[in-house]
């Protein structure tokens, strides 16, 4: 219907936790206020949508009782009604999980978190499965596949550009969400992984920007999550 549905985390400072919301954007750039569609008693963040067998699914990061893991939901009535299916990969604390299909396998890229759920943003972990709905995800033998605070943590969906596979990565050096980079995936198999940095982006292209968090592009629409410095009196 010529509209974009932007899935995002809203953080409620009064509750000290996040919930998931949707902004609807039309082709003229008009957008709605965020509409909450998923909230729990604990923190939710980083929604990632994927399609499997003509059905939409959503994974998101969760921090509950100091544990960080992934939850899987199935869409029952797009875009606001989603049904919980199961937890994924509960034995390793993970944040910012990103689903990707490649060479007949499903892959989850996620940053390893500390036991208290606070990510160091330094280690990128990789898991694979033949079925994205499975609770059997195999850790890659090279984990962590990236150990670098400047690009390890996922910063949005993996995408194709100019016949290359691009993985956005967060730069969390000095501060969380300092910027992001485009990293080309060179090898992605059950036994191999290799990537190289293509370009890094800093929050220097607009006055007031102090951080870049995520990058997503789909069907001609690009969404960048930024942080700005504002006066509380404005």
Predicted regions and their residues:
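Carbohydrate-active catalytic/glycan-binding domains of CAZyme proteins
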Residues: 1-234
């Amino acid at each position: 219907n010529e509209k974009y549905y932007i899935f995002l985390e809203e953080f409620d400072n009064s509750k000290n936790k996040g919930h998931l919301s949707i902004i609807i954007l039309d082709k003229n750039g008009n957008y709605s206020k965020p509409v909450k569609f998923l909230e729990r008693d604990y923190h939710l963040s980083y929604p990632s949508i994927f399609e499997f067998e003509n059905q939409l699914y959503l994974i998101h990061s969760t921090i509950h009782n100091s544990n960080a893991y992934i939850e899987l939901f199935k869409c029952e009535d797009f875009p606001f009604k989603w049904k919980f299916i199961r937890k994924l990969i509960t034995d390793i604390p993970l944040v910012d999980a990103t689903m990707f299909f490649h060479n007949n396998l499903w892959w989850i890229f996620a940053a390893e978190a500390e036991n208290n759920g606070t990510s160091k943003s330094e280690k990128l972990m990789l898991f694979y499965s033949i079925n994205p709905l499975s609770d059997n995800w195999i850790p890659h033998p090279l984990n962590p596949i990236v150990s670098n605070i400047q690009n390890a943590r996922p910063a949005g969906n993996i995408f194709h550009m100019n016949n290359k596979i691009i993985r956005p990565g967060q730069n969390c050096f000095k501060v969380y969400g300092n910027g992001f980079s485009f990293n080309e995936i060179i090898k992605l198999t059950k036994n191999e992984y290799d990537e190289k940095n293509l370009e890094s982006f800093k929050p220097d292209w607009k006055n007031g920007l102090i951080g870049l968090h995520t990058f997503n592009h789909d069907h001609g629409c690009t969404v960048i999550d930024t942080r700005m410095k504002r006066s509380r009196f404005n």
